């Protein structure tokens, strides 16, 4: 199955043109840069039951080229994630709800119960929010789970990050927060949502556009669903994943038609969130004029280009990994293909010493 991996990716002329634009926001490798300028990303997620997802997201971000990649998770998850890679900075700042005490445990000593700082979402968030000033991008949701304390803490961090104008990629159970309270991100054009099919349906129902979305594809074409949801969210960028990826903020819609692999193993979406995060970090570097790029891209199009780049990288990783592994493909196989996917799609920007 390796013959296909040796050939280049198949794409339309439009996709090729879009990738050429994305490439303009990829920083060259320059001696003058210092650590942290080309992307400081943090993944908030990771719980006792889910340690792989935040790792895959953070590693995709790092492998693609972010300078610093953090994971903010629970202590139990941190112990595990630290064994996966020494390249990630892992912060055990999140807390899950304490187990409910039975009536026979009501007289338990304080040592058997969690202290107030471990059960108050405001106090937990207060340990995380000061980190935001040192970060460029947040990924929220991989491995988060539905624990109420974790969810409430994330809601407070999202609010603080929005106030600071930090770009955010929301996935998995972070989307449950949006479903319950769309105002968390509604109208925030630095937010990106990456729902799967089920999550997409929940979001449309929560926004009251489920019937509109149901009819949209029949009457207005295949991109109408994602456009309707993005408009309902007030301009938030939404990724509708599928045989093709459709990306829309309700005004501009992009289609990523690169061929991907055929295996749908869990965890591939984590490569997507991490890849988008790195491109969003590069967006900041582009806006800060860290290198001479000629200002050929408009600020308004950079979020879309970043998401396009992340989607393209993920689909190419999937194609390469499937060509090698076939039906045995796992999420970790995509992680191993990130650099090759980047070279296939963008080549390497010339280094200048």
Swiss-Prot record:
One of its GO terms (biological process) is nicotinamide nucleotide metabolic process. InterPro entries: Carbohydrate_kinase_pred_CS, CARKD, Ribokinase-like. Disulfide bonds: none annotated. Residues 95-121 are annotated as: Disordered. Pfam families: Carb_kinase. It comes from the Eukaryota. Residues 96-114 have a biased composition (Low complexity). GO terms for cellular component: cytoplasm. ATP binds at residues 241-245, 260-269. It is an enzyme of class 4 (lyase). Belongs to the NnrD/CARKD family. Catalyzes the dehydration of the S-form of NAD(P)HX at the expense of ATP, which is converted to ADP. Together with NAD(P)HX epimerase, which catalyzes the epimerization of the S- and R-forms, the enzyme allows the repair of both epimers of NAD(P)HX, a damaged form of NAD(P)H that is a result of enzymatic or heat-dependent hydration. This is ATP-dependent (S)-NAD(P)H-hydrate dehydratase. The lineage of its organism: Eukaryota, Fungi, Dikarya, Ascomycota, Pezizomycotina.
């Amino acid at each position: 199955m390796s013959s296909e991996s040796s050939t280049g990716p198949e794409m339309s002329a439009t996709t090729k043109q879009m990738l050429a634009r994305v490439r303009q926001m990829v920083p060259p490798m320059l001696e003058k840069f210092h650590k942290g300028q080309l992307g400081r990303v943090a993944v908030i997620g990771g719980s006792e039951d889910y340690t792989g997802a935040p790792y895959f997201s953070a590693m995709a971000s790092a492998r693609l080229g972010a300078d610093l990649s953090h994971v903010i998770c629970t202590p139990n998850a941190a112990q595990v994630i630290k064994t996966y890679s020494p390249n990630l900075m892992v912060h055990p700042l999140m807390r899950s709800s304490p187990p409910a005490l039975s009536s026979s445990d009501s007289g338990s000593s304080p040592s058997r119960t969690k202290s107030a700082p471990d059960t108050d979402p405001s106090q937990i968030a207060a340990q995380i929010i000061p980190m935001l000033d040192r970060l460029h991008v947040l990924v929220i949701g991989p491995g988060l789970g539905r624990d109420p304390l974790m969810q409430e803490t994330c809601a407070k961090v999202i609010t603080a990050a929005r106030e600071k104008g930090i770009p955010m990629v929301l996935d998995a159970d972070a989307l449950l927060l949006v479903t319950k309270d769309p105002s968390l991100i509604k109208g925030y054009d630095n937010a990106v949502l990456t729902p799967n099919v089920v999550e997409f349906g929940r979001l449309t129902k929560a926004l009251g556009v489920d019937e509109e979305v149901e009819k949209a594809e029949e009457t207005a074409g295949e991109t109408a669903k994602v456009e309707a949801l993005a408009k309902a969210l007030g301009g938030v960028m939404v990724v509708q994943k599928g045989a093709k990826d459709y990306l829309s903020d309700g005004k501009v819609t992009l289609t990523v038609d690169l061929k991907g692999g055929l295996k749908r193993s869990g965890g591939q979406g984590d490569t997507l969130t991490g890849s988008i995060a790195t491109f969003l970090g590069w967006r900041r570097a582009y806006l800060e004029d860290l290198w001479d790029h000629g200002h050929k891209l408009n600020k308004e199009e950079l979020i879309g280009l970043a998401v396009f780049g992340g989607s393209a990288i993920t689909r190419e990783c999937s194609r390469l990994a499937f060509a090698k592994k076939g039906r045995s493909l796992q999420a970790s196989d995509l992680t191993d293909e990130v650099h090759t996917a980047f070279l296939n799609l963008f080549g390497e920007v010339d280094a200048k010493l």
